[in-house]
């Protein structure tokens, strides 16, 4: 991954065209690369039995964008140089962008990932994400996470819950929620990420990633930032989405 500076506009261009690359699952596309091997999970195999080392296990989970409990038949892409790899080696985002003079979070539903850039434009952390699904059966319509530029306006704790889902009374856990667009928020997913966009419009994250964003990176409105919370840019799912208006669904 080149380390030269890239502007935010370049990120938008790069990620808009990601769906052609990510037309299949993230895992299937990695499996086509010579630097990866792919395995089918067998009965009684688990993350721990397949990848006893914490470092290796974390990288494989993040590459495949999932951390749910493994089941027989699931496909996993594994780097051939796993033991010497760093998670930044597999970032779908540039390692450096033009400085924006403020911190920035980018969410790419196409890459099923998020990125955190410091004020100097350096990528300091990225991770898997599960954004709004193409269709939600319980409400009978699409529930994409809305593309655009937003700012975090409300921060929650580990006890944050949805007041809407599951229907009709809500109650779904949304630990470390960070609301950025009406009822849409970044938050942890205690049940794990499945490797595809599956939410009602929120952006689901690993719980430890959400906790880090909530307490170590993202800021809500306060006097020090002129009451402008941390910027969150949500990229389109595909080029057409920039000219369409998916139905809005609040919360998880």
Residue ranges of model-derived segments:
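Exported/periplasmic cell-wall-interacting domains
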Residues: 141-147, 159-252
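Primarily a LysM-type cell-wall glycan-binding module
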Residues: 25-55
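Extracellular LysM carbohydrate-binding repeats and other cell-envelope/extracellular binding modules
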Residues: 24-32, 57-93
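Bacterial N-terminal signal peptides that target proteins for export
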Residues: 1-8
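Extracytoplasmic
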Residues: 34-36, 55, 71-73, 99-102, ...
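A structural motif detector for short, solvent-exposed N-terminal "entry" segments of globular domains
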Residues: 88-137
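Solvent-exposed coil/turn segments that connect beta secondary-structure elements
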Residues: 65, 80-83, 110-111, 119-122, ...
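N-terminal signal peptide c-region/cleavage motif recognized by signal peptidases
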Residues: 18-20
């Amino acid at each position: 991954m080149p380390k030269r500076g890239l502007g935010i506009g370049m990120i938008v261009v790069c990620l808009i065209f990601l769906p052609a690359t990510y037309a299949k699952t993230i895992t299937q596309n990695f499996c086509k690369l010579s630097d990866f091997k792919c395995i089918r999970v067998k009965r009684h195999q688990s993350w721990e039995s397949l990848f006893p080392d914490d470092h290796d296990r974390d990288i494989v989970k993040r590459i495949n964008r999932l951390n749910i409990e493994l089941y027989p038949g699931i496909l996993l892409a594994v780097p051939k140089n796993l033991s010497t790899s760093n998670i930044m080696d597999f970032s779908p985002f540039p390692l450096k962008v033009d400085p924006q003079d403020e911190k920035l979070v980018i969410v790419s539903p196409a890459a099923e990932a998020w990125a955190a850039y410091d004020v100097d434009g350096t990528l300091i952390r990225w991770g898997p994400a599960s954004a709004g699904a193409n269709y939600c059966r319980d409400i009978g319509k699409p529930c994409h996470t809305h593309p655009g530029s937003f700012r975090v306006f409300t921060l929650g704790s580990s006890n944050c819950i949805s007041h809407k889902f599951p229907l009709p009374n809500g109650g779904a856990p949304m630990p470390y929620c960070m609301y950025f667009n009406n009822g849409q928020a970044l938050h942890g997913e205690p049940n794990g990420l499945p490797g595809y966009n599956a939410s009602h419009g929120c952006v689901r994250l690993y719980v430890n990633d959400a906790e880090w964003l909530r307490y170590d990176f993202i800021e809500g409105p306060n006097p020090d930032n002129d009451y402008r919370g941390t910027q969150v840019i949500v990229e389109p799912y595909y080029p057409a989405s920039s000219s369409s208006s998916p139905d809005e669904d609040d919360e998880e």
